[in-house]
């Protein structure tokens, strides 16, 4: 999970009440140990709570809970963020799941297709060398059925950042256009990514509630695009499958 930030920050820092806090890409939750809260044969919940270590680099109290529920061939991932403090909690959150492509070394990645639940060309942004959003008017063309063949140079400039709810369902498809995996979400934006030039046999389909800063951004945490705000006691709950 990417929390409390998605992507990189301008100058690798954020500002709260006039104070600058250094922060690396994607925040810190992915590098911390979560507590197992509950477990059954088909569901597990994990929790991460703010502590002295997190408060020193991110001055907000939080409770982050993540649930995984298996139902047949479907996995539902649920994020629940609670603000236990009296002051507002500002955060971003996103997924970073990776899926095999090609499957079992059958063909090349460029033989496969993406399928989106739209027949309109997708506008996407690209990340510059500093990890920030730069050019955001690129076009990913899909056919009338939503298919787009994966190009071997598709990820040469890092992730494709797709904003404005242009799609809510993305499938990976075999060379004969048969979907073998679908990610469904209600996020305002999502990313598509695979390591550039490494021949990595996977593609990430990432629902996001937040993203990296633009190269032109110059403001405080409250002014960041897609920042989520919880008042005292409020709960943020989202899921994807």
Model regions: which residues?
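Beta-strand-rich interaction surfaces with strong enrichment in secreted/lumenal proteins
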Residues: 65-67, 225-230
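Acidic/His-leaning functional-site neighborhoods
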Residues: 21, 26-38, 144-225
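Acidic-aromatic substrate-binding/catalytic surfaces of carbohydrate-active enzymes
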Residues: 1-19
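Short Pro-Gly-centered flexible turn/kink motifs
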Residues: 14-18, 79, 228-241
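Active-site/ligand-binding surface loops and adjacent short beta/alpha elements
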Residues: 88, 98-185
């Amino acid at each position: 999970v990417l929390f409390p930030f998605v992507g990189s920050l301008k100058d690798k820092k954020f500002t709260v009440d006039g104070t600058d806090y250094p922060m690396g890409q994607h925040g810190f939750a992915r590098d911390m140990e979560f507590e197992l809260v509950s477990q059954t044969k088909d569901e597990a919940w994990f929790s991460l709570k703010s502590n002295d270590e997190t408060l020193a680099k991110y001055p907000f109290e939080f409770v982050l809970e993540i649930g995984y529920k298996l139902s047949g061939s479907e996995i539902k991932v649920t994020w629940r963020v609670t603000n236990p403090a009296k002051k507002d909690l500002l955060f971003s959150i996103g997924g970073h799941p990776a899926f095999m492509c090609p499957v079992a070394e059958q063909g090349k990645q460029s033989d496969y297709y993406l399928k989106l639940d739209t027949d309109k060309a997708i506008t996407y942004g690209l990340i510059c060398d500093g990890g920030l959003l730069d050019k955001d008017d690129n076009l990913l063309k899909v056919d009338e059925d939503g298919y787009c063949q994966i190009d071997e140079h598709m990820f040469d400039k890092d992730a494709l950042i797709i904003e404005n709810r242009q799609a809510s369902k993305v499938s990976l498809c075999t060379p004969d256009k048969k979907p073998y995996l679908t990610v469904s979400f209600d996020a305002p934006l999502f990313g598509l990514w695979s390591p550039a030039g490494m021949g990595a046999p996977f593609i990430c389909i990432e629902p996001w509630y937040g993203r990296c800063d633009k190269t032109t951004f110059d403001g405080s945490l409250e002014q960041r695009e897609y920042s989520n705000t919880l008042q005292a006691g409020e709960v943020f709950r989202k899921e994807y499958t």
